[in-house]
Amino acid sequence: MAIQPANFFQSLAGVPVLYDRLHADHYGKTGIPYKFHCTSDLQAVLEVFFQDLFARTVAFGQPQSILSAGAWVNKPGQHGQGKAFDLDAIHWERVKFVSLEQPTRKTLYLAIQALCNKHLGVVLGYDYNPAHHDHLHVDISRTVGFREVSSVTQFLQQALNTFYGQTLGVDGEYGEDTETALKATLAVLGIPNVTTSRQLEEISQCRLRRGSFTCSGRS
């Protein structure tokens, strides 16, 4: 049996976090106040992540709610250790992000996923497998940085396709085609190599900037 951490949060960056899985029709729309138990380390990282996100999305209006499938869960793995969080949706005054809408809103999805990669060591998104279509799983089981693993490679392939016109298969395999496309993009951006989370974030030119949302240029 996984031991529930005593630590919990009900808001992040001053925004209420709601549990949206009590009823099927709540998903991505609304939720109930909830105590999200997790380690204090995870809470601290999530706090910084959402502060960063909301500072970059002033043009979206005031953030109103964060919707989640949960943090600590009584099961094996990072959730059972209180080190993982599932992000379903974020509501601002003028914009709504819902994880399940990735196929039709890739620009926004990838921008948020890029920021997740900047702050959290493991990010499992829509392309990872069908079980992750409806949420972004983030956890602190690994240090932040670039790794040639399927979850990071899938993000990389989607970003290269979406923002640089590549036609890579999003299969999570870091092969010759992906490496060639990556090197060409790094040359355009003036980045010698991808070794840090910041460099990984910069691959996506679709940026969440302070006060605006743009898909061109560098910050």
List each language-model region with its residue ranges:
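Conserved short secondary-structure elements within globular domains
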Residues: 51, 55-76, 108-125
